[in-house]
C-alpha cells in the first residue's frame, strides 16, 4: 500500500467515526483597525474614516468592559449598510415589499480616549521553531517555482493565482511547527493548479467559495498537505485529525460522497510528486 492510499483510507476511516470539529491552527493576529469586543477588523472604508490604528468600540461597549471614555473626547464615525423593508406600489395597486440598503453610522472611540482598559496583546505567540526537512521542501519548491511567499503576522492563509503568491501567518502564531507546515503545504497544493504546473485551471474555472468545484479543490489541497506531512514523518495526531475535519467540512458540499476523497487523492498524488520534485 503506497502513502497516498494509506492516507486516503485512514482519513475515510476517521470520517466514518462521525463529526470532527475543525480548529484554526494559528492564533489570531490583532493588527490594523479593529473592534475591541468582536476583535474583527473594520471594513476598508471604515479604516479610511478612522484616524488611528488599533482598538475602537462604542461608548456602551467600552463601558461594558469597565472602560470610561475621558471627558471631552470626541467620537469618530464608522458606517454600515442596513437592509430596510420599503413598500412600493405595483401597477395593480398591489403593495410590494423590497429590501433597500440604507447607510447607517455608529460613533466609536479609540482606546487612547478611554481610561481603565489595557490594550490587547497584538498576537499570541508561541516558541515554535522550524523543522529543517520541512523547511527545505517548502523553500526548494518556492524558489524553484519563483512563487512569492509572504510570512508574517496575519489572520489568513491563502494562495493568490493573480500574482502567484502565498501568504501565511508567522510560524510563532502556530502552537506546533507541524501545523505551520500543514498550512503551508495546503497553500502550495493550491498553487499547483496553474496550467504550467499540475493544470487544474479548467477544473477551477467556475469555482467560487462554497460551490462544488471549490470544494473539490480544497480536498486536493488538504490531501496534498496530509500526504506530504506523512511522507516527511512529521504528521502528528493533531495535524491528521484537523486534516480529516477540514476535509469533512468541504465534503458536506459534495453530499458526503467519500468517492470524492479517492478522486482528490489521485490528483494530490500528482501534486505531491510535483512539489517534492520526484517521479
Residues covered by each model-derived region:
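N-terminal accessory/interface modules of nucleic-acid-binding and processing proteins
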Residues: 1-279
